[in-house]
Amino acid sequence: MRSVVQRVTQASVTVEGEVVGRIGAGLLVLFGVGRGDTEADLNWMVDKIAGLRLFEDGEGKMNRSVQDVGGEILMVSQFTLYGDCRKGKRPSFATAAPPETAGELFQQAVAKMRGYGLHVETGVFQAEMQVALVNDGPVTLLIDSEKNF
């Protein structure tokens, strides 16, 4: 499981000209599911994101989590995080999970994130989406449940 996590002052996702998800200050999470990912990967990823200390404390240190600051989360499913560009010019997505599996795990991740008491907005699974954001910092992290990076 892979995620790109960005600290934002605001973010939104639009499908067919309609805003389907919008947040204020918090985290934009681009969320990818790989072949073979399990509930253990999901639990690790959601726990990691919910607890990441990416927000400044009173001394200006990144010492507070999205939970600590009452931030929001916009989660957008993105299979292209599994694009392999090592050969040729066109990425291969062979290591991305099939849509049925990815959709189920994405919905479970959203539910688990909401279980932390966080306000979570989402995009639309498998839709063409436009994501707008104002990156704060900028703070952008790559997270992989296999701990590849």
From Swiss-Prot:
Protein name according to UniProt: D-aminoacyl-tRNA deacylase
EC supergroup of this enzyme: hydrolase
GO MF term list: D-tyrosyl-tRNA(Tyr) deacylase activity; Gly-tRNA(Ala) deacylase activity; Ser(Gly)-tRNA(Ala) hydrolase activity; tRNA binding
CDD domains, A to Z: Dtyr_deacylase
Gene Ontology annotations of biological process type: D-amino acid catabolic process
Keywords assigned by UniProt, alphabetized: Cytoplasm, Hydrolase, RNA-binding, tRNA-binding
Entry GO terms, CC: cytoplasm
Span of the annotated motif Gly-cisPro motif, important for rejection of L-amino acids: 137-138
Listed PANTHER family: D-AMINOACYL-TRNA DEACYLASE 1, D-TYROSYL-TRNA TYR DEACYLASE
Disulfide bonds: none
